[in-house]
A protein has these predicted regions:
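Amphipathic, heptad-repeat alpha-helical segments
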Residues: 36-69
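Alpha-helical bundle protein-protein interaction modules that mediate dimerization/oligomerization
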Residues: 68-148
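N-terminal segments that cap or nucleate solenoid repeat domains
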Residues: 147-191, 197-200, 204
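Leucine-rich repeat
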Residues: 186-187, 229, 270-271, 311-312, ...
């Protein structure tokens, strides 16, 4: 039998009368619980609870502002109702002539005992919060901008006390205040995580019978998860990921968006990412990317990107159909979703043959090639190129698709000329590794000057080597060799890089380029290098036993000797 809820008192004097009635009933129960004749074991447990209640009531009476707290206006009437019900039950258990049903009496006793336990918990929570020692606690007033940490801490404790003890309206108002606090003060999230009961807040995510409370709680948990490392850690450690994934799976559109934000934030910590699989969240995230709103898709694919580096989850992504969903987001998602999807595809493409094959089977390579032409975001382009590079090395078939696409090769050449350093390096790496046709090499010959400039840059690591390999590949075409030596600035840069005193570049790189220029035997190419002063530097590098220098200097010197002998013969 459920205890009835008494009408809240309307004045302090009425509340005092109510407290007196509670004390009177409690005193009676403390004695009668020791003299009952039936269910003695249950009454012994109840006696212990009643003793604790007596202590709590005494503490409330000693609190200077207890009558001002609105929670007591509901708690005390409910408590009196429970005690009065227990008094009636104790009379029945004491009466030797009681002829009622034992099972019914036992059930009523257990229900009243459970109600008393809940009310004890609420009173204990209220006392521990310290709010009964503060004045004007009837109105939950937001601390002002100049409030100190102590005032803010009290506000948060009071807020969570109302949230845990109060009814639905108390909960809604407390959550509304919490959301205002988190929105108005970014730094408050850490204090909320420290002073508030985040575990209870997470419990409200499964508050299905009160959608309004559940929605507000989801917004609050999402804000905490996204605020900073400290509050995010508390949300995860208090078990927030599981309920958030359930909301992402079956909540309303608005709730799914908030849940996706939180899941992305939580999984940003590599130490948390593994748990997605434990909660069965891979399939949930994939479905959110497939059918969610644009906002949900953006954050869900961000979460997938976060977990894609976890070895066990990579295979799960393939098995749950993530690849076609990610490839679709590459062409249909907003800019942020595109960037995250491209990043994830790049990770998967570098993760083994199984995932690379899935990407190729879904025509992922063609979509990536198309994106190189259409996307202006440098970050997204970087991920796309990394994915392309991984796929290009997976099979001869994919390499042929790339090298035979004139449009793609021309776009790569444009990135070498106009992209940032990372894009230039990745593009140069592709040019140097693909078996590009002579026609396509001629089509991008104009990027050779940019490649020479890149050879001078010591950072990022590997840039000089990539630029050199791309140049050597392009210089297998005669017209490109002639075009490069006609570029006086590029020739002078090469000669300066050959100088042993120049330590900004490893000498093998410019030597490889010079060797590629003179390999065709063109007199004009050699003459321009000689006129620019390449020979003495090469000679010195040969003496230093730099790889390739001896052969390169022989080619230059051989041509020079032929010229001398020709002049002597004519004379």
């Amino acid at each position: 039998m459920q205890p009835t809820t008494a009408k809240p008192p309307t004045s302090t004097s009425a509340l005092q009368i109510l407290l007196n009635l509670i004390n009177e009933t409690l005193s009676h129960l403390l004695l009668s619980s020791l003299t009952v004749r039936s269910f003695i074991g249950r009454w012994q447990v109840l006696h212990s609870k009643l003793t604790s209640l007596s202590s709590s009531i005494s503490s409330i009476s000693d609190s200077p502002h207890w009558a001002e707290n609105p929670l007591l206006h509901t708690l005390l009437p409910n408590l009196l109702s429970t005690l009065q019900r227990l008094k009636a039950l104790s009379d029945q258990c004491t009466d030797a002539t009681y002829a009622g049903g034992k099972l019914h009496l036992q059930s009523d006793l257990d229900m009243a005992s459970a109600a008393l336990s809940n009310q004890l918990h609420d009173l204990d929570l209220l006392l521990r919060s310290g709010v009964l020692h503060q004045s004007n606690a009837i109105v939950l007033s937001h601390p002002g901008p100049g409030s100190g940490k102590d005032d803010l801490g009290f506000f948060i404790r009071d807020l969570f006390t109302r949230l845990q003890i109060g009814g639905v309206e108390f909960k809604k108002k407390a959550l509304e205040s919490l959301l205002h606090l988190l929105e108005d003060d970014e730094k408050s999230a850490s204090l909320v995580a420290k002073e508030g009961n985040v575990a209870y807040l997470i419990h409200l995510l499964d508050f299905h019978n009160q959608p309004g409370v559940r929605e507000q709680a989801t917004c609050a948990v999402s804000a905490l998860a996204a605020a900073n490392d400290e509050s995010r850690k508390v949300v995860f450690e208090e078990g927030g990921l599981g309920p958030l994934l359930r909301i992402l799976e079956s909540g309303s559109t608005a709730l799914k968006e908030k849940a996706a934000i939180a899941v992305e934030a939580i999984t940003a910590d590599p130490e948390n990412a593994w748990a997605v699989s434990a909660y069965g969240g891979v399939a949930v995230l994939v479905e959110a990317c497939r059918s969610g709103s644009p906002a949900t898709q953006t954050h869900a694919v961000g979460a997938i990107r976060n977990v894609a580096n976890v070895e066990d989850i990579k295979m799960g992504l393939g098995e749950e159909g993530a690849v076609p969903v990610l490839l679709q987001l590459l062409v249909s998602g907003n800019g942020v979703a595109q960037e995250k999807a491209a990043s994830t595809v790049a990770v998967l493409a570098s993760s083994g043959e199984y995932l690379r094959d899935l990407i190729v089977q879904e025509r992922g390579l063609q979509r990536l090639m198309h994106l190189v032409q259409d996307i202006s975001s440098s970050d997204t382009l970087e991920h796309v190129l990394r994915a392309v590079i991984s796929l290009s090395s997976s099979s001869d078939h994919t390499a042929r698709i790339l090298s035979s696409s004139t449009i793609f090769i021309i776009q790569i050449g444009e990135l070498i000329k106009r992209g940032n350093l990372v894009l230039q390096q990745l593009s140069a790496l592709l040019v140097g590794s693909l078996a590009i046709s002579d026609g396509n090499k001629r089509a991008i010959g104009s990027c050779m000057g940019s490649l020479v400039k890149l050879m001078e840059s010591p950072k990022p690591v590997g840039l000089q080597e990539s630029a050199t390999q791309a140049l050597v590949s392009l210089l297998t075409v005669r017209s490109n060799r002639k075009e490069l030596v006609r570029d006086e600035k590029s020739v002078m840069r090469l000669v300066l890089m050959l100088d042993p005193k120049n330590e900004t570049v490893a000498k093998t790189f410019p030597v490889m380029v010079v060797a590629a220029i003179v390999a065709g035997g063109s007199h004009s190419c050699r003459k321009r290098l000689l006129d620019a002063g390449a020979h003495p530097h090469l000679q010195r590098l040969s003496e230093m036993e730099v790889a390739g220098a001896k052969r390169a200097v022989q080619r230059l010197a051989g041509n020079r000797l032929k010229t001398i002998f020709s002049r002597t013969w004519r004379e």
